[in-house]
Curated annotation (Swiss-Prot):
Keywords: Glycoprotein, Hydrolase, Lipid degradation, Lipid metabolism, Secreted, Signal
GO biological process: lipid catabolic process
Transmembrane segments: none
Record's protein name: GDSL esterase/lipase At1g06990
Pfam families: Lipase_GDSL (PF00657)
EC assignment: 3.1.1.-
Disulfide bonds: none
GO molecular function: hydrolase activity, acting on ester bonds
Active site: 44 (nucleophile), 335, 338
Similarity comment text for this entry: Belongs to the 'GDSL' lipolytic enzyme family.
Compartment(s): Secreted
UniProt keyword annotation of Nucleotide-binding present: no
């Protein structure tokens, strides 16, 4: 009930804001301290800035990205403000924002309370990482090992192992894999088909979660796919086949099918890994509800991003010279792939409810 009240208060307040720089959102924690730290892996939905420090064209460390982040800073987050890990960390009473592990200025406190290893543009499929020059999940696991070593230097081996085992671990990836290798280019589709590619990705998810477990993580939430067919970029790609901008049913059906398989796989993994709590995090439901019932959330545009035309703008195509919409809070998406901050708030609150359900 508290979660729904928070959503209502945020959305009601934000209706009075009409410009990108007019507001900064702070979600107050609910005085819950279930976890000593938060550790984050995956892609641009949760990358808080690691790509700033690697050689890749997949970056968001320039305006108008971050125009609603505290200080109106473009931190490398692919949205107009904060992301899922920031809001969850805040709601859980861990900290207000989750820094990227590659930030050279991390404090001991930053390390102790957790960091982000995610890399925008990455996926479970190595083809995705090679296409975008980003950090694969294997490299992210290596970064976790480096993190544990640094944490041990600060608090000692025993305390470090305790922090890692009790930390909330969030994994969010896969969308880039399906977009790049299944729908937009035929590389994997021709060889494996949809069902075969889903099995391939699930195998890679299994291997990655196993690796996290072997390093010491025990409380792991793996997020499923969003309604991929409702992403503006996918609607744009499909315009040659359909004359209107609307969600692509087949791609959404594929997402739902994959998510059910993922949920089943994670349940099986938990039963085989002693002392683990490995569970599925649903983001499909919240995003699809916003896409199909926008009035509930004060949204007026769900098929285009706020940046530029909202149909093709992403990364360097969404820049300081690009026109942006007057009120991002009325848009489900910030650019042609990534949700707006208001959407991330709704998704994060939904995930917090799921975390409480599983772990409380």
């Amino acid at each position: 009930m508290l979660i729904h009240v928070i959503i209502f208060m945020i959305i009601t307040t934000m209706q009075f804001s009409t410009t990108c720089h007019a507001y900064v959102i702070n979600v107050t924690n609910v005085n819950v301290s279930m976890f000593p730290a938060i550790l984050v892996f995956g892609d641009s939905t949760i990358d808080t800035g690691n790509n700033n420090y690697i050689k890749t064209y997949i970056r968001a460390n320039f305006p108008p990205y971050g125009c609603n982040f505290p200080g109106h800073n473009a931190t490398g987050r692919f949205s107009n403000g904060k992301l899922i890990p920031d809001f969850i960390a805040s709601l859980m009473g861990i900290k207000d924002t989750v820094p990227p592990f590659l930030d050279p200025h991390l404090s001991d406190s930053d390390i102790i309370t957790g960091v982000c290893f995610a890399s925008a543009g990455s996926g479970y499929d190595n083809l995705t990482d090679r296409a975008t020059s980003t950090l694969s999940v294997d490299k992210q696991a290596d970064m976790l090992r480096s993190y544990v070593e640094r944490l041990s230097q600060i608090v000692g081996d025993e305390k470090a192992a305790s922090i890692v085992s009790e930390a909330l671990v969030i994994v969010s990836s896969g969308t880039n894999d399906f977009n790049l290798n299944l729908y937009d280019t035929p590389s994997r589709r021709q060889k494996l088909g949809v069902d075969g590619y889903q099995s391939f990705i699930l195998s890679n998810v299994h291997n990655f979660v196993q690796e996290l477990y072997d390093i010491g993580c025990r409380k792991i939430m793996v997020l499923g796919l969003p309604p991929v067919g409702c992403l503006p970029i996918q609607m744009t790609m499909a315009m040659q086949k359909q004359n209107e901008r609307r969600c692509i049913d087949k791609q959404n059906s594929d997402s739902q099918e994959f998510n059910q398989k993922l949920k089943n796989s994670l349940t099986e993994m938990q039963s085989n890994l002693t002392g683990s709590v490995i569970f599925y995090g649903d983001i499909y439901g919240a995003l699809f509800d916003m896409a199909t019932n926008p009035q509930r959330y004060g949204l007026k545009e769900t098929t285009r991003g706020c940046c530029g035309t909202g149909e093709i703008e992403l990364a360097y195509l969404c820049n300081a010279l690009t026109r942006i919409c007057p009120n991002p809070n009325q848009y489900l998406f910030w650019d042609d792939i990534h949700p707006s901050q208001i959407a991330y708030i709704v998704i994060s609150l939904s995930l917090v409810e799921q975390i409480f359900h599983v772990l409380s």
